[in-house]
Amino acid sequence: MKKSKFLKVFSSAMALSVILAGCSTSNNSSSKNAPKAKVEFKTEVDNGGSAVDGATLKYGILSPTPLTGMWNPIFSTQATDYEVIGNIVGDTFSTDDERKVKQDNEDDPVKFHLDREKKEITFTVHKDLKWSDGSEVTAKDIVATYELMGNPKFKENARYTNAFDLIEGMKDYHDGKADKISGITEKDNKTVVVKYTEIKPSVLFGEGWISNVLNAKQVEEASKDFTKFAEADLNKKPLSFGPYVIAKEVNGESVLAEANPHYYKKDDVKVKKIEFKVVSPAQASSVIKN
């Protein structure tokens, strides 16, 4: 059976810009009161037909730079890499229209609860959440992620900011004065409480806490030698509790992602395979035509 073609280029990096320039400095009231042109863009396209079972969605990323292969959802710093890994792991915490984290959402992979009076954030792992190797996601994974963020030996860490110093004991840990972060408590197998010295309004926008979770065993292995950190499985072959996992990679060019069989909402994943491929601006028009 002949398969229908998928859209070859689909990227949030590809957008149409409209520039409106006003040149007159006149006080003419008719100019000031003139109605503004209304410009509308379609955000969805329906090409008709039905989905092809087992087909692969082609996802183009418009970029002049290649993929670096850093697939860590926290420490990845290149936009093209994060375009891939962000779609693979999905969101750990849901947000509202203002991009503020939603509290007490039982359906999230990890539930977020802020207690301003106690200056605490409680993270609760969803009971059905599993890594792509079938093992449970636990409180130990959350604690390990924070310990990696503040690890004093991780000199190349570009993600650590002063906002993390508001976690009790984090600065001492980050400065090498303590072996553990005193303000982080593993309450039970699924719950972690993070104590702060101060709660700022920006905390609801993700400042001062980590918006994803890494696998504790992979963190432990990667932390043994930070001179080889970039090549660790934590970054090259990270376990995922999101909708997809990395199945194949062509260095610098493309990534094939397949549906995670252990995803806690696997019935919601309708597209079973996605091929992410970097498309240079010079090639974009020819790729769309084909």
Task: Pin down the residues of each PLM region.
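Sec-dependent N-terminal signal peptides of Gram-positive bacterial secreted proteins and lipoproteins
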Residues: 2-26
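Bacterial lipoprotein signal-peptidase II cleavage site
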Residues: 23-35
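N-terminal low-complexity, Pro/Thr/Ser-rich intrinsically disordered segments
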Residues: 32-57
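N-terminal lobe/hinge region of extracytoplasmic solute-binding protein
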Residues: 58-116, 239
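Extracellular/periplasmic solute-recognition and catalytic clefts
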Residues: 61, 247-258, 275-290
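Aromatic- and charge-enriched surface segment that lines or borders ligand/interaction sites
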Residues: 110-160
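Surface-exposed binding/hinge segments that line
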Residues: 159-221
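Gly/Pro-rich hinge or "lid" segments in bacterial periplasmic/extracellular proteins
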Residues: 208-269, 273
